[in-house]
Amino acid sequence: MYNKIKWALIAMILSSVVNAAERDFTPSAPVPSRVLGWVEKAMILPGHLVMNAKMDTGALTSSLDAKGLTPFQRDGKDWVRFDVETQDDNDKVTSQSFEREIVREVTLRGAGGKDDRPVVLMKICIGDQIYEEQFTLRDRGEMKYPLLIGRRTIAHVGLIDVTRQYVLPLKCTE
């Protein structure tokens, strides 16, 4: 008898806590209204370099395929020089050089060992919006997608529909 009363009291307490939690719940951030596919066209600015971008919810920071990474100093700060290449539907390759200040460095650890990468700010267009976001730089030549969009950027862009691709047409004019 005592055991039944104890479990009934526990059930009532838990029920009131859950109801109170549901009643008092407010989202911590507004829900983005746009929906995008798990792969979208993106444009690196300046230069209007268009490439396929994979929405990578497993990565916190976005990553860009960068060739010829060359660190250097400017005004006592760490900078990096690199090239970004794109290939259009006719297999024409376009390349553009960039110089960016290194805002931080990250060390990634995986099955292949330790990988140190510079992080820079880059402007990117997805759909009709331009975002200035942090990107790790790495030669991703062996990877299918030259551009990975991480969770920090996805939070600004919208929700991902994993059953769709190329939902948002590029409409940036900068």
Question: Where are the regions a protein language model picked out?
Answer:
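Pepsin/retropepsin-fold aspartyl endopeptidases
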Residues: 20-174
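Bacterial N-terminal signal peptides
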Residues: 6-16
